[in-house]
């Protein structure tokens, strides 16, 4: 039967090719698209049901039950949402796991609707959060949900966020347990001298209830009397020649979450300070509650996650995850008999799989296809641009440690050239936070406006001399925030080459990219990155952009606390960790210049990297001269401002305080904002009730098939 279906599909595809080629021949795009159709058909044959004569109606699959088939552009890195906090994983686990709180569809505010709680109570001092669980809730394996099980989930998140091998992966749990978001146990030490205002950074506790100390990076800061919202004009001293600064004394920190316990059948969470973000953070799929029986000794899952949601995972193989209804679900039974979530990394493959009736809906529709899909009766709902595409700049890199180089990159990028690869509604990003938060950033453009002459002068100030900077980006994948990574990379890097930067592309598989993009490293230079905001709070944007620096500090705290006798792993006392020391200053670049030219076009795949053609990069113009460098706050000061904003008593007060953070991040420049992007979904007419979400993670349990 399966072979018959494949043969039928092949014949149909061949007829379509002949019909199209008959009168006008095939363009290159046609050839690519029909090739995509053939490969998509092969990938989906195993799970495709009988096609309908009307593609826009989808294939009803009456004989096989009500099966909803969805294609996304990236495979789940793994099905553990805590260790794989990416949209492709969340899209699967959102159908399986439930969280303590959910986000209101319209406002994003944390709520108990469709959550595991029937009540959420916050004490007057905002330090104690009590979660009263619903009665008679069971995991899909029949095990009852208890407060003790929820406590074990919190303990797991803590262990992963503070573990040496997982700290860089568990980005959503960083504000709960890792470095910088809790409360410092001693004030930052300030140098009283007039010409040095270094402040030590800090790390979070390895355990939820205890403080920890870590050696942090010495970082010069802006004068305390300086208005943080003042003009961003280039001022201050030119490049310094010293290579390093002395490490300061350790600073102890208490994490945000200090205790989680069961009390009278409820879960009680105690915080070290008030936090406006805390409830919002818990709405993420990373905090979906999983049966603790699956937690291994290393806190990693021993099998696919088992949750309390409307569906359970039946299988996951060959890029397709099959979900079946959870017989123990206590809510309204879904009107679907099965969900199939497959991976098609090309928008052409997804488009033709949709019009051929192989799938019922797909993510990330190519802008050029929207008109035809609408004319053919497909639904094409869009998502708000609650997202960010950016360049992460590794402050532990020997070149990017220099603040003038990071600022030069910000002034070099041509954001306007990137719009051609995104749907209408995409806009330039001037800051690292979504405009929807309405945070005033009066001087933001001074840090991000394109100015090639200033960029070249800043490189001269830093002493840049053609040193190589590697740029990581994901290859052979399609993401909600970047449908065509290779094209976006090539367009972006061209503007960096124009000002004289020597950029070498490092295309990575999706799995490699996810593992390396946040890990402490002095090798990674730039990473082309992005995300959709996963919860309705500004830290949903600041957190991912700062995650690599937070991970570095967290690993540093683990090393500081490790016994002298340990000789393996990153806990070895002799290990040399990458350091962001001096990342807020203009310490002159010490790295050896490279005779190699810069790579202009990106290779099509990691395998082609070695044979990628190179083109000489323009050198900085001879007239480029050093310029005064504006002072920057330290990373510790930025985190201090973030904590102050998050502790505010109201959203309005928070907004004003976060304006300071936006300015500080513009000065420090740990990442270069590029775009706030939107994306589209294509859905056949047979699907009813499809509702897009601001965070690009949709729920399928309430869908209906006609």
Model regions and ranges:
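Aromatic- and charge-enriched surface segment that lines or borders ligand/interaction sites
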Residues: 119-176, 180, 268
């Amino acid at each position: 039967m399966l072979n018959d279906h494949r043969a039928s599909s092949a014949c149909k595809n061949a007829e379509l090719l002949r019909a199209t080629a008959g009168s006008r021949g095939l363009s290159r795009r046609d050839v690519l698209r029909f090739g995509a159709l053939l490969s998509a058909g092969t990938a989906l044959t195993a799970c495709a049901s009988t096609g309908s004569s009307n593609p826009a109606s989808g294939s009803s699959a009456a004989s096989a039950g009500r099966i909803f088939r969805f294609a996304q552009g990236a495979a789940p890195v793994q099905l553990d949402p805590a260790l794989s906090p990416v949209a492709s994983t969340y899209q699967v686990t959102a159908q399986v796991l439930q969280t303590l709180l959910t986000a209101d569809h319209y406002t994003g505010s944390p709520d108990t609707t469709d959550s595991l709680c029937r009540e959420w109570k916050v004490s007057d001092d905002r330090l104690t959060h009590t979660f009263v669980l619903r009665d008679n809730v069971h995991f899909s394996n029949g095990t009852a949900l208890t407060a003790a099980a929820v406590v074990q989930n919190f303990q797991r998140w803590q262990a992963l966020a503070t573990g040496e091998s997982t700290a860089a992966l568990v980005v959503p749990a960083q504000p709960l347990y890792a470095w910088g978001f809790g409360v410092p146990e001693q004030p930052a030490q300030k140098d009283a001298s007039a010409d040095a205002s270094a402040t030590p950074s800090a790390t979070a506790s390895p355990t939820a209830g205890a403080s920890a100390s870590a050696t942090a990076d010495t970082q010069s800061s802006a004068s305390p009397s300086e208005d943080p919202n003042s003009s961003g004009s280039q001022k201050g001293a030119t490049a310094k020649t010293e290579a390093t600064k002395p490490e300061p004394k350790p600073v102890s920190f208490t994490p945000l979450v200090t205790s989680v316990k069961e009390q009278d059948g409820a879960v009680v969470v105690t915080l070290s300070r008030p936090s406006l973000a805390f409830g919002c953070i818990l709405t993420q799929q990373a905090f979906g509650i999983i049966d603790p029986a699956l937690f291994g000794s290393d806190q990693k899952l021993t099998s696919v996650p088992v949750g309390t949601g409307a569906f359970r995972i039946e299988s996951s193989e060959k890029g397709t995850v099959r979900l079946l209804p959870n017989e123990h679900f206590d809510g309204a039974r879904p009107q679907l008999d099965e969900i199939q979530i497959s991976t098609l990394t090309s928008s052409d493959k997804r488009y033709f799989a949709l019009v051929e009736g192989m799938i019922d809906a797909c993510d990330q529709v190519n802008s050029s296809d929207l008109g035809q899909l609408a004319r053919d009766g497909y639904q094409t709902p869009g998502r708000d641009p609650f997202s960010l595409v950016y360049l992460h700049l590794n402050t532990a890199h020997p070149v990017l440690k220099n603040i003038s180089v990071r600022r030069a990159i910000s002034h070099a990028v041509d954001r306007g050239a990137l719009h051609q690869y995104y749907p209408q509604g995409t806009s330039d990003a001037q800051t690292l936070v979504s405009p929807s938060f309405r945070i005033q950033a009066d001087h933001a453009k001074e840090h991000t406006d394109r100015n090639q002459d200033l960029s070249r002068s800043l490189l001269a100030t830093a002493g840049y001399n053609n040193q190589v900077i590697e740029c990581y980006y994901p290859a052979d994948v399609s993401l909600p925030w970047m449908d065509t990574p290779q094209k976006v990379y090539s367009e972006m890097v061209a503007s960096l080459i124009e000002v004289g930067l020597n950029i070498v592309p490092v295309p990575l598989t999706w799995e490699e990219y996810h593992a390396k993009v946040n890990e402490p490293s002095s090798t990674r230079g730039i990473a082309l990155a992005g995300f959709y905001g996963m919860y309705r709070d500004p830290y949903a944007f600041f957190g991912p952009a700062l995650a690599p620096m937070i991970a570095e500090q967290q690993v540093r705290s683990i090393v500081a606390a490790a016994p002298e006798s340990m000789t393996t792993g990153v806990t070895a006392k002799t290990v040399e960790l990458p350091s962001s020391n001096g990342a807020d200053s203009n310490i002159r670049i010490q790295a050896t210049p490279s005779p190699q030219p810069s790579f202009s076009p990106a290779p099509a795949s990691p395998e082609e990297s070695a044979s990628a053609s190179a083109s000489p990069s323009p050198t900085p113009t001879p007239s480029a001269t050093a310029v005064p460098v504006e002072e920057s706050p330290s990373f510790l000061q930025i985190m201090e401002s973030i904590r102050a904003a998050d502790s505010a008593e109201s959203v309005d007060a928070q907004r004003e305080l976060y304006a300071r953070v936006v300015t500080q991040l513009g000065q420090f420049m740990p990442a270069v904002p590029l775009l706030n992007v939107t994306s589209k979904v294509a859905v056949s007419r047979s699907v009813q009730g499809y509702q897009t979400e601001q965070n690009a993670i949709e729920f399928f349990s309430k869908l209906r098939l006609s």
